[in-house]
């Protein structure tokens, strides 16, 4: 007897991935704490936890892609869930960046006597904002224009053009990451060099980490577009990647103005 479904929602099958992801996260957290406190076996537990967590992420997302692309379970009602989740995730990321910019502004607007009452602290070298930082700043907004091009191509049903646009986006992202690496290689200060080094490298490094995650996200979208997974009505994964990438490229303007330029001169 064939069961009929009188609603537009997807009732997922039982899955082992939530519990395996929880165990991987637990092992990663405990292993990280043990490693930082030089406990024996901490590095091993941390490595195993990360491997287990990454494997769980891969197979869980694989199942989601199978359910949406091959089995057709992601109706319009189901697609609202990932969209709302992506928006809330980006909002939480905004709060994280706000925290780091607040720390930098708090330290630079009222420098304490421990750092000489000046900003940047006396004896701390800073990067010239008009060299690599200025060169790197317009690259991410340019990649944002490329990902918008890809979005319009998907909506127009032009698959090859969407692939070309995603390739352009990824290439610009890789160039940006390369420039970020050059910045850190040439940086005259480290994360342990006073509050300036801590806030500078934490804020810019956190943003650089988001660029890497967004690049991986877009690479997967590019592969899926090449395989014909994304259509006019079913491209929620790409939309989430595009929203995330626009967030990343806009955020780049804030550290340049507040940390590289104003906070470093």
UniProtKB/Swiss-Prot annotation:
Alphabetic keyword roster: Membrane, Mitochondrion, Mitochondrion inner membrane, Translocase, Transmembrane, Transmembrane helix
E.C. number(s) listed in UniProt: 7.1.1.9
Location in or out of the cell: Mitochondrion inner membrane
Transmembrane segments: 16-36, 41-61, 84-104, 162-182, 200-220, 242-262
Entry's Gene Ontology molecular function annotations: cytochrome-c oxidase activity
Catalytic activity, as annotated: 4 Fe(II)-[cytochrome c] + O2 + 8 H(+)(in) = 4 Fe(III)-[cytochrome c] + 2 H2O + 4 H(+)(out)
BP GO terms, sorted: mitochondrial electron transport, cytochrome c to oxygen
GO CC annotation terms, alphabetical: mitochondrial inner membrane; mitochondrion
Pfam families, A to Z: COX3
Membrane topology: Multi-pass membrane protein
Job of this protein: Component of the cytochrome c oxidase, the last enzyme in the mitochondrial electron transport chain which drives oxidative phosphorylation. The respiratory chain contains 3 multisubunit complexes succinate dehydrogenase (complex II, CII), ubiquinol-cytochrome c oxidoreductase (cytochrome b-c1 complex, complex III, CIII) and cytochrome c oxidase (complex IV, CIV), that cooperate to transfer electrons derived from NADH and succinate to molecular oxygen, creating an electrochemical gradient over the inner membrane that drives transmembrane transport and the ATP synthase.
Complex and partners: Component of the cytochrome c oxidase (complex IV, CIV), a multisubunit enzyme composed of a catalytic core of 3 subunits and several supernumerary subunits. The complex exists as a monomer or a dimer and forms supercomplexes (SCs) in the inner mitochondrial membrane with ubiquinol-cytochrome c oxidoreductase (cytochrome b-c1 complex, complex III, CIII).
Protein name: Cytochrome c oxidase subunit 3
